[in-house]
Amino acid sequence: MKKFFEGLKNFIKKEPVLFAALLLAVLAVCLIRPGLELCLQAIDFRTLAILFSLMIVIKAFQSQNFLDFIAARLLRLCKTRRALYFLLTYLVFFSSMFVTNDVALLTFVPITLLIFRRIELPALHIVVLETLAANLGSCITPMGNPQNLYLFSYYSFSALEFFALTARIALPSLFILAVIIVFLTRRKLADHGGMAEPHELSGNVLQTQVVRLKADFRTALYFADFVICLLTVFHVVNYLIMLGFTIVVMAVCNWRLFKKVDYSLLLTFVGFFIFTKSLSKVPAFTDFVNSLLSSPLKTYLTGIAASQVISNVPAALLLSGFTENGAMLLLAVNVGGLGTLIASMASVISFKLYTAENHDNYFVVFTAYNIVLLIILGIIVYLI
């Protein structure tokens, strides 16, 4: 019994969101008794299949050193600290649109820490910037993060509708990130009358980052699989065809990739699907949530607030069942990825990577950046 509770404690510590989702689903099934048929109807198998396929094909790209290779080549172009900040930040921003925010951070934060050790500069602010860039860049495409993929399917957005909405986040974000970088990399020199000047990088410290691309027949199959995944997202290819193709490709090319899929995220979705559908059968709860989502502004504020407490993916799953205003909810949970450390679980990744090697006040700096940007961007996005 002692081992059981120790195991449970470790599981909760490792997977708190998954534990909460499963617990809520079990409680809902026991108390509300929705029935097996309703539970199966609640699960969006298409979203789960696309999410699974995207996760495994991105792991495949990582196994080929694809992102590392591109990053290493581009970094050789940097001559100043400002250029390095811009390149790293926007690499994360644009790559997160296609490989998700967490993969972008898992790829580029370690590279960033290595580079900044070599050039003997503190990496605190650039890692925070990369985290902001990952969360904001991933907002732009349906496959950029799990909540976008789910909401794109749930509300049946057209591609034009979706990108018109996410552009309201993308355009201000690009400008704000640029302003922050220029401010951070200014260098006040007395002999320049206090004007700002970017630091130059001495020597060839960025030339030593050697990464070899593992280009072979598998790379071509992975690209084909990725294209099929994108076509499935936009309803061109049936999700069962995509799933079958993905399973065959990965089984032939590298079956070990199946072990690297984040199955806890898939189970988290299942838990919240069942919990939300079950609660929709409780009139009192439905009336309460509907009152919180009764107007576009209320939906926007509720989505942001919920994201701060339970993270934006669960917020999207929970609130989507109670509002037809998909546009405002989409904006809310993406803007709501800013703010607290758990507002976007991708933020926890960079926090762990940075604090494993450094012991300065990352949490304070991260929170300060995020709260300020949440307020500024939250107002801008709503008013546009």
Which residues are covered by each model-predicted region?
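Cytoplasmic-side transmembrane-helix entry/capping segments in multi-pass membrane proteins
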Residues: F45, A72-R76, R81-R82, H125-L132, ...
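Membrane-interfacial loop-to-helix junctions in multi-pass transporters
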Residues: F45-T47, L75-T89, R118-I126, F217-A220, ...
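Transmembrane helical segments that form the transport core of multi-pass membrane transport proteins
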Residues: A42, Q64, A71, A224-G321
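Interfacial loop-to-helix junctions that mark the boundaries of transmembrane helices
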Residues: L8-K14, E37-T47, A159-I169, L213-K214, ...
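Hydrophobic transmembrane alpha-helices that form the pore/transport pathway of multi-pass ion
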Residues: T89-Y90, F94-C139, Y150, A316-L331, ...
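Juxtamembrane and boundary regions of transmembrane helices in multi-pass small-molecule transporters
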Residues: K2-K3, L160-R212, I342-I384
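Hydrophobic mid-bilayer segments of alpha-helices in multi-pass membrane transport proteins
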Residues: F4-E6, N10-R33, D44-I56, R218-C229, ...
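Membrane-embedded hairpin module used as a gating/binding unit in multi-pass transport
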Residues: L177-I181, L189-A190, G194-K259
